[in-house]
Structure formats: structure tokens, C-alpha cells
A protein has these predicted regions:
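Ligand-binding pockets and gating/stacking loops
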Residues: 1-454
Length: 454
């Protein structure tokens, strides 16, 4: 095995498995350089990697079930937020943030596409169904372009929904607006990857694209795991680790194997697909499993320091997906426009909670992973969950549903509800960029920062 460095690899035929940087091997080899890097971007004051991620939910939320209150012991969680109970001391729920460029203005209908495009850009999307799309660079890509060279991948873009970059999708708005969160320039969306298998191969397959495909085919033919090809390197590495970190290595290897097995299973089995939502080959049919796999892959990418910036389109805005496992046969978008009927409003709240449960599971896993500085990965992260529509019935874009998880390496005050009092959502992004080590005086339609979060 090569001499230890910050990104040690377990290597085998067609496989390159990154070793998490928190292992004692990399910690001892890089303690001085790591702890002296506190002034570097995307790094905490202790020298650990600082991560940033963004996740979008569609169609707003059921207002009566979303917003919490503050109590003597922190956040008093609302019904939708109850899945966050185990990590409620490590999050902030932010109210009072607005996205004015998601409103109709002079552009008329098309709130869902417009909101999706505005969420991470803070910019107004040009109303067009043609190739002359124009919105703004997204906050994740501002960060990626400044600090992305520090990791194998500048950023990671994932989707649990379809991918569409051509045609008209919402009242004269191009599909690119509705199906992409990340934009590397005002005219260039960064297409997310919806196939967990391809994400897995990108993270752990060796070689260039064509060679990775050949290596994958070889493993499929022999019915072997990626881990089977690196066992000797793993044994050699384990001998160099402390007993505590050998356990961490075993846990990491086990998590990789479990995800690989879940991907294989998802490729073979699943629920009957929604007839209105054709599923591309290789994408899990079970929607909840698809979201969970994407979040677990994001966790592995962070854990191995393959990237420090990620985004996940949980579902495109305007999604009319049904949820038969929840006993919901009506489409989500339809339900949001019929919330005057109490029983239908309850179904919207159930869908909101379904999404929140996936997010909560992810945060709990992050909170169990120890980072190179001894803190948890969640402590050393800033994770935004929300959307650019507040009330899906009236298509409002003020007082948006936003959760900010993680302590940003100790720079954020968690365990509370914060009222931003009608500030642009872009102010939050300015604040996050600066705490990420990317100097920013403005972003999108910001009019300052959001010091309230710290």
C-alpha cells in the first residue's frame, strides 16, 4: 500500500476505495498540516473538513404542521419536524426567509419551475422554453469554484427524481429550471445524477469512464463486491491502525458493502412504478429507498473527503407523485391545491413528514461519524433543507420552510428556532459562504448577511 497521505486508497483490480481521513493513519501523517490549515477555506478552526450541502423539497409545506416554537429546553418541534427529535439540539429551524424572485412578478404562471430555479441562485429565471435559459450561479457552485480543488470532486449533484434539460415543463418555463438545483453559470445547469449505481462507481471505481465500465462489467460477471478486490490492502492498512480506528475502518467498510448490496437489491426489486413517472434503467423503483441511497452516498462522499459540497434534488418542484405506502393515492401537487379539505391537508402533512424522516435519518448517521478533530461530521457541516415555495396552495414565497443542520465547525448556534423577519434567503447563503471560507459581500438578491444563525 502506498505511503500514508491525506487521501489514502485501498486499491485492487478496477477499484479505488478512499480511506476516511479520520483514521489514525492519516491523522498521524497529517496532524501538523491539518491543524495548521484552519485559515484555509472549507476547513474548521480545528483543521477538519467543513462540509456544505443543500436539499430541496417540492410544493411547499402544510403550514399548520411545520413551524416550531422555542421552549426552555430548546426547540418545541412541530408535528412535521418531530422526526428530528434525536438531533434537535444540532439544528436551527429558520423562519422569515423570502425568495422574491420566485414570485410571479411580470412573468405570470410557472411558480414551480421558477421556485426551483431560484432556490439556490436567489435570481429570477428568464421565462423561456427555449435554449436561451438564464438564471444565476447557485451558492453551491460559487463555493465549488473557489474551494473545490481541495477534493477529488469539486461538488456532487444528486437527484431522486427524473432528469430533464430540454423542452417546456411549466407554463412556458424550460424543463432545465424545474429539474436542476445547481448552476455553474447563469446559463449552465449542473445536471444531477439520479442513478445511485453510477454515483457509487464514480466514487469507488478506478480508471477513466470507459475503463470504469469495463471494471464494473468484470465485477458483475464474477458477482463480486468492490470490497473483494481490496481485501489485502485493507488487511495491511488495519495492521497500521490503532484498535479504535480499526473498528472505524470495519464500520466504514461495512457501510460501503451495505450500500452496494442495497443498490444491487434496488436494481432487482421494488414497488410497482408510478405510471405517470417512468423510471430510467438502474434507478431504484422504491422512492424512499432512492432518497436514502442518495443520502448515504452523500455521507460516504463526505466521510472520505471526496467532496465537501453537495446538493440533492429530492423531488422536482411541481411533482405530482403518489405515495401508496402512506395510503395516499392522490398526487402531491393536487393535494397542495386542495388543503381547504382537512383530510387532504393531513395527507400533505404526511408527505412532508415522509421527506423529513429521510433527512432526519441522514443527520443521525452524520452525528455518529467521528471526524479527524474528534467532533462529529454533523458538527463540522452546514446542511440546508427546504424549498422556495412556502404555501403550496397559494404559491407563496415568503416565510419559507428552512432547516439549517450542523454547527458549521462550531460557528453556528444550534437547538433553536430563528425568525429572520423577512430577509432574503440569499442572506443565509452569504453567511454560509463566509463561514465556509469563501469571501462574499453579496449573493443573488441579498441585502446583507444573516448573523442571527451564529
Amino acid at each position: 500500500m502506498p505511503k500514508a497521505n491525506r487521501r489514502a486508497f485501498l486499491r485492487g483490480a478496477g477499484v479505488s476505495l478512499v480511506v476516511p481521513p479520520f483514521l489514525s493513519l492519516t491523522r498521524s501523517a497529517n496532524a501538523a498540516s491539518s491543524l495548521s490549515s484552519a485559515a484555509h477555506p472549507a476547513t474548521t478552526a480545528t483543521g477538519a473538513p467543513l462540509r456544505m450541502a443543500f436539499m430541496s423539497i417540492p410544493n411547499g409545506v402544510q403550514q399548520d404542521h411545520w413551524f416550531p416554537t422555542n421552549s426552555e429546553d430548546g426547540i418545541a418541534l412541530s408535528p412535521t419536524l418531530e422526526p428530528l427529535a434525536k438531533v434537535k439540539g444540532k439544528i436551527q429551524v429558520i423562519g422569515g426567509l423570502d425568495h422574491v424572485h420566485a414570485t410571479a412578478g411580470n412573468d405570470g404562471a410557472g411558480d414551480h419551475a421558477r421556485a426551483n430555479a431560484t432556490f439556490l441562485t436567489g435570481a429570477r429565471a428568464r421565462k423561456t422554453a427555449g435554449k436561451d435559459i438564464h438564471v444565476g450561479i447557485s451558492v453551491d457552485q460559487v463555493a465549488a469554484q473557489r474551494v473545490g480543488a481541495a477534493t477529488r470532486f469539486q461538488s456532487l449533484e444528486l437527484s431522486s427524481d427524473a432528469v430533464r434539460n430540454s423542452g417546456s415543463c411549466d407554463s412556458g418555463y424550460a424543463c432545465a429550471y424545474q429539474y436542476n438545483l445547481s448552476w455553474s453559470s447563469p446559463t449552465t445547469p449542473v445536471t444531477p445524477e439520479p442513478n445511485p449505481r453510477l454515483v457509487f462507481e464514480r466514487l469507488f471505481g478506478a480508471g477513466e469512464h470507459g475503463q470504469r465500465q469495463k471494471n464494473f462489467d468484470l465485477r458483475q460477471q464474477s458477482n463480486r463486491s468492490v470490497l473483494d478486490f481490496v481485501l489485502e490492502d485493507a488487511k495491511e492498512l488495519a495492521r497500521a491502525l490503532s484498535s479504535e480506528d480499526r473498528i472505524k475502518l470495519e464500520e466504514y467498510v461495512s457501510s460501503v458493502r451495505q450500500i452496494e448490496e442495497r443498490i444491487k437489491s434496488a436494481e432487482r426489486f421494488g414497488l410497482v412504478p408510478d405510471p405517470n413517472l417512468p423510471t430510467p434503467d438502474g434507478v431504484p423503483i422504491d422512492f424512499g429507498n432512492h432518497i436514502d441511497l442518495n443520502l448515504d452516498l452523500m455521507l460516504l462522499a463526505f466521510q472520505t473527503d471526496s467532496t465537501r459540497i453537495a446538493s440533492l434534488l429530492i423531488a422536482y418542484d411541481g411533482s405530482n407523485r403518489t405515495f401508496p405506502d402512506l395510503g395516499i393515492i392522490e398526487g402531491h401537487h393536487y393535494l397542495t391545491h386542495n388543503q381547504r379539505v382537512p383530510e387532504l391537508a393531513k395527507k400533505v402533512a404526511l408527505i412532508d413528514r415522509f421527506y423529513m424522516q429521510r433527512f432526519a435519518n441522514f443527520l443521525e448517521k452524520m452525528d455518529k461519524v467521528r471526524d479527524v478533530d474528534g467532533n462529529t461530521m454533523l458538527h463540522n457541516s452546514m446542511i440546508v433543507y427546504g424549498g422556495a415555495i412556502a404555501d403550496g396552495n397559494r404559491h407563496t414565497h415568503a416565510n419559507l420552510p428552512v432547516v439549517l443542520a450542523g454547527a458549521g465547525g462550531g460557528t453556528l448556534k444550534t437547538g433553536r428556532f430563528v425568525d429572520a423577519k423577512q430577509k432574503p434567503m440569499s442572506n443565509l447563503f452569504v453567511e454560509m459562504l463566509n463561514r465556509f471560507g469563501v469571501e462574499a459581500t453579496s449573493f443573488g438578491d441579498s441585502n446583507g448577511g444573516l448573523s442571527e444563525i451564529g
